[in-house]
A protein has these predicted regions:
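Canonical Radical SAM [4Fe-4S] cluster-binding loop centered on the CxxxCxxC motif
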Residues: 16
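Conserved N-terminal catalytic core of the sugar/cofactor nucleotidyltransferase
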Residues: 2-5, 13, 27, 31-96
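The conserved acidic donor/metal-binding loop of glycosyltransferases
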Residues: 99-101
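Conserved core of the sugar-phosphate nucleotidyltransferase
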Residues: 63, 105-150
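Short alpha-helical oligomerization interface
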Residues: 19-24
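Active-site micro-motifs of SAM-dependent methyltransferase domains
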Residues: 12, 103
Length: 150
């Protein structure tokens, strides 16, 4: 099993917080987002870590994991970034994470235990959280449809 962290973008909506560093270098408490994600992978025995980088790629040099460069990071989207890891996705089971969303180590543990072809974590209370950020929560929300298991 491998981890893929999507960290190519700048996070320009964060303004001055990403002028000198990628959004994944911002902190929750005393720890950078990227470090928390990697630590949660390692705790769950995901040793092969791949990071798709772009903006400020040199800042990622000392971070554990293989770096995969998206040279089109300014003009492409998250799916293009993910396509940079196509060989890995085709050859191994992978957990894919955004670099600016922190998942609890227990959430990663749940993903590791699942056996479906595609498994997605979701928060059933998403709307309450997104209403804090946006008047219309659907303005900036990535979404998916799902059916419950029987």
């Amino acid at each position: 099993m491998q981890g893929i962290i999507l960290a190519a973008g700048r996070g320009s909506r964060l303004g001055h917080l990403t002028e000198k560093k990628p959004k994944s270098f911002n902190k929750s408490g005393k720890k950078r987002y990227i470090d928390t994600i990697i630590d949660n992978y390692i705790i769950n025995k995901i040793k092969k870590i791949n990071i798709i980088v772009g903006y400020k790629k040199d800042l990622f040099k000392k971070i554990r994991g293989k770096k995969i460069y998206n040279r089109k990071w300014q003009s492409s989207n998250i799916f293009y970034s993910l396509s940079r890891a196509e060989k890995i996705l085709k050859s191994d089971t992978c957990i894919v994470s955004y670099s600016d969303i922190i998942y609890d180590k227990e959430a990663i543990k749940l993903l590791v235990k699942e056996s479906g072809d595609i498994v997605i974590l979701n928060n059933v209370n998403w709307k309450k959280i997104w209403k804090i950020r946006f008047k219309n929560p659907l303005d900036d929300l990535e979404n998916f449809n799902y059916s419950k298991r029987s």
